[in-house]
Amino acid sequence: RLPKGHRLRVAISTAYWPLLWPTPKAAPVVLTAGTLTLPKRPLTKHSDEWHFEPAETSTPLKATQIKPAHHIRRNEVDQRTGLVSLIIEDDFGTSHIDDHGLISGSTARERWDIHPDNPISAKGHAHWTQTNARDNGWAVRTEALCGMHADEQSFHLWAEMSAFETNPDGKEEQVFHEHQNWSVPRDFM
């Protein structure tokens, strides 16, 4: 409920970067006078608040934390060029799963760039690392990278996947690698 005397602010934008990819050209917006009609929530029997039953859940996974998670969200503006970047760095930590001994960890790095005056400058890049190991020396790691940019006609994407396994002698060896590129027509997007 909106308390008496409070106001709602309606924000209208032609961009929702980086959640939605921008159109190839800046889109104009023309607003004329209008109204906003919001539904009124009916009162319940005892109050004007909703109450829900507790959620059903399974037994939590029993794990021992080896390295805590750490997350960074950072915006950067290149003062020379005006390029705006969103940098996301997620270290999800490392845990030992007590029931079966798997040691698991992962990190994710993302970068989303755009120049505010040039929607076609948008580009994104992500790099995910997943590690799994056991106390007996067995270990595997995957590296997944992908990126995207666009021109006025097409979206251009690339992806790369690599997998590594640690040999019994302790040496890590690449056991898989693939790289692909695609171009997809924008079809007025």
Features from the language model and the residues they span:
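Glycine/threonine-rich phosphate-binding loop and adjacent beta-strand/alpha-helix elements that clamp
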Residues: R1-M189
